[in-house]
Each structure stands twice: as C-alpha cells, then as structure tokens.
C-alpha cells in the first residue's frame, strides 16, 4: 500500500509542477497570451499530431514496463530484483547520454526549418556517427566491467549469466541509436508517418517476453 501512495505522490507532484510552471510563465510573459480562433483544418491537424504523439509515447512506455511486469508475474520478486540491479546500471548510463538528445532537439528542429535537406541529412550522419561511437564505447565497457562490478556490489548469488549481459548490451546499443532517430522525429513532428511502429514494437516485445520467460 505504501508503494501505491508513492506512485500517487509522484503523479500529484508532477501535476503541481506543471500548474506552477504555467502560472509562473503567464506572469513572466503576459504579452504572449493567445488570441483568436484556429481554423477547423488546423485544429484537426493538431489533434492528429497529438494523437500520434500519444500513441508513440504509450508504445515506448509499454516496452519499458512489460519486462518488469512479466518477470515479477512469472519469475517472482527475487528474479525481478536481480534484473532491476542490472537495469539500474544500464539506465543510469542511458540518462547521461539522454542529456545530449534533450539539448539537441530544439536545435535540430530549427535546422529542419531553416536549412536545406542536404544539410540536415549530413548533420544526421554526423550525429549517427557520434552516437554510434559513444554507444560502442559504453557497450565495450559494459561487456568487460558489468560482471566484475555486479560481483563486488551484490555478490555471485545475485548475478545473471554473461548471456544476459550481452542481451543488455545489445538492448543498450539499439535503444541509443533509436533515440537519435526519435529525436529527429520529435523535432520535425513526423509522428503520423511512424504511428504504428511503436505499437508493433510494444506488442512484439510483450509476445517475446511471454515466450522467452518460459525458457528461464
């Protein structure tokens, strides 16, 4: 029950933060209050984009949540705790790299508007090389340091096999490359063209979870 209160507290805190931010922004920039009405076509287009963005985000939330739910339901909390220890290390490194994507999104969006398609394509190739290099270096470190660190941290009794570490590393690399393309997708607002992929990925991930959990 305490955990449920904790989750509700997170939700309430986020709502309060959003409301406070809106109030502060209105006071700091009163001259930017919207006036007039939008055309029906513009409203419909905005609704389509919001719906497609919502679908995209829901798909990625399901992907991240399905693993935890399936492991806890089929293998128990002990296996889930071991998995979460490994995933905690992985996600911590991913958060550091996420700073790069977050800081570049606005600049990428501006470049898509004001620069040529050739310039944006060249930038995408440079970003792809940079993220591939950073992710590759992290992947090599994971392969060599994951197990020794986990042995020092939790002991041999609470460790996964090396095969699981390889799976974590593959997941990490794919996620980082995918985040780059998602950054460009978010910056350019092309969620409609890609609206089904997150749902297909989420469904595939759930099916593979239910299938592979039987081989644990």
Over which residues does each language-model region extend?
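Short runs within selected transmembrane alpha-helices of multi-pass transporters and secretion channels
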Residues: 6-23, 56, 60-64, 87, ...
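Membrane-helix interface residues
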Residues: 75-78, 112, 189-191, 215-216
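Interhelical loop/hinge segments that connect adjacent transmembrane helices in multipass membrane
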Residues: 3-10, 21-65, 69, 107-122
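Alpha-helical transmembrane segments of multi-pass membrane transport and lipid-handling proteins
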Residues: 122-176, 203-215
């Amino acid at each position: 029950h305490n955990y449920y209160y904790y989750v509700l507290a997170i939700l309430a805190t986020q709502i309060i933060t959003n409301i406070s931010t809106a109030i502060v922004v209105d006071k700091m920039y009163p001259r930017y209050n919207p006036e007039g009405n939008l055309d029906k076509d513009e409203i419909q287009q905005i609704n389509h984009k919001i719906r497609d963005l919502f679908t995209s985000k829901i798909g990625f939330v399901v992907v991240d949540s399905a693993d935890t739910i399936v492991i806890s339901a089929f293998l128990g909390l002990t296996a889930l705790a071991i998995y979460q220890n490994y995933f905690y290390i992985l996600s911590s490194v991913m958060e550091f790299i996420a700073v790069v994507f977050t800081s570049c999104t606005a600049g990428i969006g501006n470049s898509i508007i004001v620069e040529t398609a050739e310039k944006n394509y060249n930038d995408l190739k440079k970003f792809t090389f940079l993220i591939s290099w950073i992710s590759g270096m992290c992947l090599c470190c994971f392969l060599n340091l994951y197990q020794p660190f986990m042995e020092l941290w939790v002991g041999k009794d609470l460790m996964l096999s090396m095969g699981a570490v390889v799976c974590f590393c593959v997941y990490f690399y794919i996620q980082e490359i995918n985040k780059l393309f998602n950054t460009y997708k978010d910056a350019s607002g092309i969620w409609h063209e890609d609206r089904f992929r997150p749902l297909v990925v989420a469904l595939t991930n759930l099916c593979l979870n239910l299938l592979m959990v039987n081989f644990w």
